[in-house]
Design a protein with these regions (language model features):
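Beta-propeller fold detector
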Residues: 70-86, 147-154, 194-201
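Beta-propeller domains
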Residues: 154-202
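Beta-propeller and closely related beta-sheet repeat lectin domains
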Residues: 6-11, 91-98, 135, 161-165, ...
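Entry beta-strands of beta-propeller and related beta-repeat scaffolds
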Residues: 16-21, 25-27, 103-109, 170-175
């Protein structure tokens, strides 16, 4: 892999490939920022020692191979990892990924960069957490729209990393974060929320 996949999310694709989304900025020895910082100096684009690139916008696909290919050492199993050709619209760290009924994948939420826990008190900016939270969602394959805000992530601000997501038989998404749940009609962007309790029945 060329990019830093630490804290990425991932999902299987219909053809048997596996895809991962986002990750960490480039790091050097001891976890320090890589040798080439991004603007703002909060993450790095590249590190000369580990030779890793910023992975926050990366999409990486592991192509499948057959048992006979593996046995014959002719395996074509390899990661495709080239952000100049395949990347997300928004950098994401600790996002969620869920396969949809049409074979696409929805990528939900996350943080703007690594090393951040969104537990600000008082929480005066629940949507963006001072620029550290990513309360939006997008798709693979990409759609020609700006990633919309998922209001459930705003309502669960404070603890919504790696939101638990489940595709339901109806085609809607059951989503859990913080102490809340939502049945999300994502195709029309409507959600029905509930506080999570032991008596909740999905």
């Amino acid at each position: 892999m060329r990019t830093n996949s630490f804290c990425s999310s991932g999902m299987h694709l219909p053809n048997g490939s596996y895809i991962t989304f986002g990750g960490n900025g480039a790091v050097g020895p001891g976890g320090v920022l890589g040798s080439q910082p991004n603007p703002g100096n909060y993450s790095a684009a590249w590190d000369a020692t580990f030779q890793d690139f910023d992975g926050t916008k990366a999409m990486r696909i592991l192509n499948p191979c057959t048992v006979s290919e593996i046995a014959s050492s002719q395996s074509q199993c390899a990661w495709f990892d080239d952000p100049t050709e395949l990347s997300m619209k928004t950098g994401r760290w600790y996002s969620a990924a869920e396969a949809l009924g049409d074979g696409s994948v929805i990528i939900i939420g996350g943080f703007a960069n690594g090393g951040y826990i969104n537990r600000n008190t008082p929480n005066i900016d629940p949507e963006n957490e001072g620029g550290a939270a990513i309360p939006t969602y997008e798709y693979f394959p990409s759609k020609p729209v700006t990633p919309p805000v998922f209001q459930f992530l705003v309502q669960t601000s404070g603890l919504n990393a790696y939101a638990l997501t489940f595709l339901m038989p109806s085609g809607n998404l059951f989503v859990q974060a913080n102490t809340s749940t939502s049945m999300w009609h994502f195709s029309i962007s409507i959600s029905y929320n509930s506080s999570l309790s032991s008596s909740f029945v999905g």
